[in-house]
Swiss-Prot record:
Protein name in UniProt: Enolase-phosphatase E1
Essential cofactor(s): Mg(2+)
One Pfam family of this chain: Hydrolase
Cofactor note as given: Binds 1 Mg(2+) ion per subunit.
PANTHER family: ENOLASE-PHOSPHATASE E1
Segment forming the signal sequence: none
EC number: 3.1.3.77
Organism of provenance: Saccharomyces cerevisiae (strain RM11-1a) (Baker's yeast)
One GO CC term, this protein: cytoplasm
Similarity remark: Belongs to the HAD-like hydrolase superfamily. MasA/MtnC family.
Biological or metabolic pathway of the protein: Amino-acid biosynthesis; L-methionine biosynthesis via salvage pathway; L-methionine from S-methyl-5-thio-alpha-D-ribose 1-phosphate: step 3/6; Amino-acid biosynthesis; L-methionine biosynthesis via salvage pathway; L-methionine from S-methyl-5-thio-alpha-D-ribose 1-phosphate: step 4/6
Matching InterPro entries: Enolase-ppase_E1 (IPR023943), ENOPH1_eukaryotes (IPR027511), HAD-like_sf (IPR036412), HAD_sf (IPR023214)
Cell compartment(s), UniProt: Cytoplasm; Nucleus
Length: 227
């Protein structure tokens, strides 16, 4: 089913890892760190440049604004930078490991051209794939899949995932024809946007994913073993 494609573009949550990972692990880790991060911020702190881009001087208001963005799951590029900074600390300390599906790990390792497209920042994507829970090893062991991935795209590099132009931008950047690419995601709006430039699409149907109305109009993949 996937042998006709030379290039694969993958979404992350709900596609290569459980959709719950972001909301039940990454978001809570971030929101727990925000108060201390904001209150202890100084002009020479590493995160000061990111926080200053919100243009909110009052620390209480800034903290409330950041937490509101998270609660509403707003795809704000400044928020994504800040999340990447905080999550880096979690990954590097061993507190966070990404539960990438075993079939997705195998898929990424065996396919020649694999690219990632997520609303999370490129930095956050590289962290996630750099600290993957090894399904065949003790809990403290992790895998680094970044060497198997050919490139990363986010809303800053390419645009919103629900806009067709974003996929045209990606095709340009990877130097591929639309007919050569298969895009896999759990979001039908993203699939429709990619199809708008002729990219083949597949709906990822993983445990915990929300039901998709008219899901029968998409090629459905419950795992990547058939690709």
């Amino acid at each position: 089913m996937g042998d006709n494609y030379s290039t694969y573009l993958l979404d992350i949550e709900g596609t290569v890892c459980p959709i719950s990972f972001v909301k039940e692990t990454l978001f809570p880790y971030f929101t727990k760190k925000v108060p201390q991060l904001v209150q202890q911020d100084t002009r020479d702190s590493p995160v000061s440049n990111i926080l200053s881009q919100f243009h909110i001087d009052d620390k209480e208001q800034l903290q409330a604004h950041i937490l509101e963005l998270v609660a509403k799951d707003v795809k704000d590029p400044i928020l994504k930078q800040l999340q990447g900074y905080i999550w880096a600390q979690g990954y590097e300390s061993g507190q966070i490991k990404a539960p990438v599906y075993a079939d997705a790990i195998d898929f990424i390792k065996r396919k020649k051209r694999v690219f990632i497209y997520s609303s999370g920042s490129v930095k956050a994507q590289k962290l996630l794939f750099g600290y993957v829970q090894d399904p065949n090893a003790p809990a403290h062991d992790s895998l680094d899949l970044n060497s198997y991935i050919d490139g990363y795209f986010d809303i800053n590099t390419s645009g919103k995932k629900t806009e067709t132009q974003s996929y045209a931008n990606i095709l340009r950047d990877i130097g591929a024809k639309a007919s050569e690419v298969l895009f896999l995601s759990d979001n039908p709006l993203e699939l429709d946007a990619a199809a708008g430039v002729g990219i083949a699409t597949g709906l990822a149907s993983r445990p915990g994913n929300a039901p998709v109305p008219d899901g029968q109009k998409y090629q459905v993949y419950k795992d990547f073993e058939t690709l």
